[in-house]
């Protein structure tokens, strides 16, 4: 899935040795499946790991990836380029801009997850939020969960009805209803 060169792995090991114990690596894509897709690497503390993350084992460290972007990371490579000036990580993900939401071979769940990542989450991320598809019930109800700044936000009702639900029902006629399964707790993380 993600080929990390030996030089890059050694670089990560060196960087992680200076971080708090338990800190690992996260690979992410902002706006996956769009022409504006951007790949990145960041530290990932134990508190940053979410239920929908996939844990990849490397030599002396782990990489966490949101399950919904796995298809965009096909044949991706992370390398460390060293020259006279210094060093730089390179991240090549040839499928990061591939739009999988139109792929009819994908399951409905995968298509909705990709749709959320491409069309809804870029807007929500401006407020530090994100929406995830938990599952599709037998009666074609999409069960979703908001995280980050959306959790506990006073505008969540509007976001749910006017953005998320309208768009899902419009683009996926097989979905009959959208239900928010988030246990909304207002706190410092909430946007409003």
UniProtKB/Swiss-Prot annotation:
Binding, [4Fe-4S] cluster: 150, 153
Subunit note: Homodimer.
Cofactor, free-text remark: Binds 1 [4Fe-4S] cluster per subunit. The cluster is presumably bound at the interface of two monomers.
Organismal lineage: Bacteria, Pseudomonadati, Pseudomonadota, Gammaproteobacteria, Enterobacterales
Keyword set includes Iron-sulfur: yes
Entry-linked Pfam families: Fe-S_biosyn, NifU
GO annotation, biological process: iron-sulfur cluster assembly; protein maturation
Name of the protein this chain belongs to: Fe/S biogenesis protein NfuA
Species annotation: Buchnera aphidicola subsp. Schizaphis graminum (strain Sg)
Name of the encoding gene: nfuA
Single Gene Ontology MF annotation: 4 iron, 4 sulfur cluster binding
Family statement: Belongs to the NfuA family.
Cofactor(s) named in the record: [4Fe-4S] cluster
Described function: Involved in iron-sulfur cluster biogenesis. Binds a 4Fe-4S cluster, can transfer this cluster to apoproteins, and thereby intervenes in the maturation of Fe/S proteins. Could also act as a scaffold/chaperone for damaged Fe/S proteins.
Keywords in alphabetical order: 4Fe-4S, Iron, Iron-sulfur, Metal-binding
């Amino acid at each position: 899935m993600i080929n990390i060169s030996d030089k890059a792995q050694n670089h990560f090991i060196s960087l992680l040795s200076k971080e708090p114990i338990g800190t690992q690596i996260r690979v992410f894509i902002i706006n996956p499946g769009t022409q504006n897709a951007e790949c990145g690497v960041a530290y990932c503390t134990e508190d940053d790991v979410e239920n929908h993350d996939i844990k990849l084992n490397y030599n002396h460290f782990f990489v966490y990836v949101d399950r919904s972007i796995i298809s965009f990371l096909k044949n991706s490579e992370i390398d460390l380029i060293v020259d006279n000036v210094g060093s730089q990580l390179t991240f090549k993900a040839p499928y990061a801009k591939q739009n999988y939401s139109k792929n009819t071979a994908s399951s409905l769940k995968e298509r909705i997850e990709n749709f959320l990542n491409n069309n809804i989450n870029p807007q929500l991320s401006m407020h530090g939020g994100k929406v995830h598809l938990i599952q599709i019930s037998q009666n074609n109800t999409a069960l979703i969960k908001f995280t980050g700044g959306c959790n506990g936000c006073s505008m969540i009702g509007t976001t749910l009805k006017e953005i998320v639900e309208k768009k899902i029902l419009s683009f996926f006629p097989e979905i009959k209803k959208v239900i928010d399964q988030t246990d909304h707790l207002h706190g410092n993380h909430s946007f409003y």
